[in-house]
A protein has these predicted regions:
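Acidic catalytic cores of enzymes that act on phosphate-bearing nucleotides/polynucleotides
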Residues: 158-237, 241, 246
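The two-metal-ion catalytic cores of nucleic-acid processing enzymes
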Residues: 240-258
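Metal-dependent phosphoesterase core characteristic of DEDDh/y 3'-5' exonuclease domains
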Residues: 1-19, 38-151, 156-159
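Generic detection of long, well-ordered alpha-helical segments
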Residues: 26, 30, 54, 132-135, ...
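A broadly tuned preference for mixed-charge, low-complexity surface segments
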Residues: 21-26, 97-116, 178-203, 258
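Metal-dependent phosphoesterase signature
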Residues: 15-32
Length: 258
């Protein structure tokens, strides 16, 4: 670590890594990310994690960029890809729940915290948030999912790439798709039937969809009202007005679509 900046005390408490220990056994950031990149960039491999696309991958990208390395290439070059088991696990809960013990939170909804899932299913996890323990736990959860429904597991794995998931999209016929996302909430098992309506005007990796579980009345509203409500948070909308049931899906982030 650099001597001019100390880690947050809460981070030290969670990891058990003090500045003294990091200085004694750690690596400079540039050397550290070089070793990480060498592993992740192995040709024809898939980087898999649990909530990794929204969290771990973003940290890895930033570290690569800060060390003057390509932050994106290892994700898609040389036959490489990435996959995230969080939404895969949500898909299993909604579509194929049998064979897995699903922990329940205080609010009555399923907990998808990795440490809760491993505890409920008798999987050794060691110290939660310890990197190696989390890796082993993620592998064991993947094994459990595949054992419970190999067909669904393999289908979602095959559809992890932008090219594969793009093949499901039919804008001419407005073919509905099943989509799993944290945006839909636990009350809906994080699942919704959506219909793709258009590609994003400036990002060809982003698909614009309408949530068929919500009222389509907004389609009758003037474009100015739609635009105003689309970019207004729920708390700022008038009473009785819900956010528009429009969602974008980033096809290069291994979304769950069926």
């Amino acid at each position: 670590p650099t001597p001019d900046r100390l880690p947050h005390p809460a981070a030290i408490r969670v990891t058990g890594i003090t500045p003294q220990l990091a200085a004694e056994q750690g690596l400079p950031e540039a050397a550290f990310i070089t070793r990480i990149h060498q592993e992740l960039a192995q040709p024809k491999t898939c980087g898999i994690g649990y909530n990794s696309i929204r969290f771990d991958d973003e940290i890895t990208r930033f570290a690569l960029w800060r060390s003057l390395r390509d932050p994106y290439g290892r994700e898609w070059q040389n036959g490489n890809s990435r996959w995230d088991l969080l939404d895969v696990t949500r898909a299993f809960r909604a579509l194929r729940p049998a064979g897995i013990e699903w922990p329940v939170r205080d609010d009555g909804f399923t907990s998808f915290r990795l440490e809760d899932l491993t505890a409920a299913n008798g999987i050794e996890h060691g110290a939660a948030h310890d990197a190696m323990a989390d890796v082993v736990a993620t592998i064991e959860i993947a094994k459990l999912l595949k054992c419970c429904d190999e067909h669904l597991f393999d289908t979602l794995y095959r559809q992890r790439t932008k090219r594969a998931v793009s093949a499901l999209v039919n804008l001419d016929d407005l073919t509905p798709l099943v989509h799993v996302s944290g945006m839909f909430g636990g009350a809906r098992h994080y699942l919704a039937l959506v219909v793709p309506v258009a590609w994003h005007p400036t990002n060809n990796s982003e698909l614009i969809c309408v949530d068929l579980g919500k009222s389509p009345d907004f389609l009758e509203q003037p474009a100015e009202i739609v635009r105003e409500h689309l970019f207004t948070s729920q708390i700022d909308l008038p009473d009785g007005v819900e956010r528009l049931p429009i969602k974008t899906i980033r096809l290069n982030r291994a979304p769950v679509l069926l």
